[in-house]
Amino acid sequence: MALYAFDGTGDEDTDRVSRDSNVLDFFRAYDGGPKNEDPSLRIGSLYLKGIGNRARSFVGDRPAQAFGVGGHRRVRQALDRLENNFETGDSVVDVIGFSRGAALAVSFANELAGKCPRVIIRFMGLWDMVGQFGAPGRRFNAGHDVSADRAAD
């Protein structure tokens, strides 16, 4: 069993933030990993920084924050990790997300429902989902399926 954790817009796991996000706290507590552990080193489970985090600049990537750019890459990362886990017999997953990360969590779950029907989503925790990608007010959502009807069973 593994956790796939999608953090919110601008959120990340660095010392530059004053407080860890709920997603990061949940991820670190999930299987007892130490608080100071680098989330990218965890085997099985996966923590994904929020869209538009400060990796590129002090203030973050404003266009990514505004339009949700980079979401497909994060979903692909999660699918790649799941594929590796599945090959070792892991077919039960938990998924969490906050803000746009919650929308990415739903998009990830919908990808699983369509492509990997043998994978079981045991738990899905979503905080304050922002299901908007691309230009504001459009229904297109840059190719993300953020409807919960396929993801929930």
Segments predicted by a language model, with ranges:
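Surface cap/lid and interfacial helix-loop subdomains adjacent to catalytic sites
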Residues: 5, 17-42, 58-65, 69-75, ...
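A conserved beta-strand->alpha-helix junction
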Residues: 39-42, 46-55
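N-terminal low-complexity, Ser/Thr- and acidic-residue-enriched intrinsically disordered segments
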Residues: 1-11, 15
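Gly/Ala-rich beta-loop-alpha elbow adjacent to hydrolase catalytic centers
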Residues: 7, 97, 101
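Active-site glycine-rich loops that stabilize anionic/oxyanionic intermediates
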Residues: 8-11, 51, 130
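Short, solvent-exposed loop/turn elements at domain surfaces
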Residues: 12-14, 55-58
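Short glycine- and Lys/Arg-enriched binding-loop motifs that mark or flank ligand-binding interfaces
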Residues: 46, 93, 97
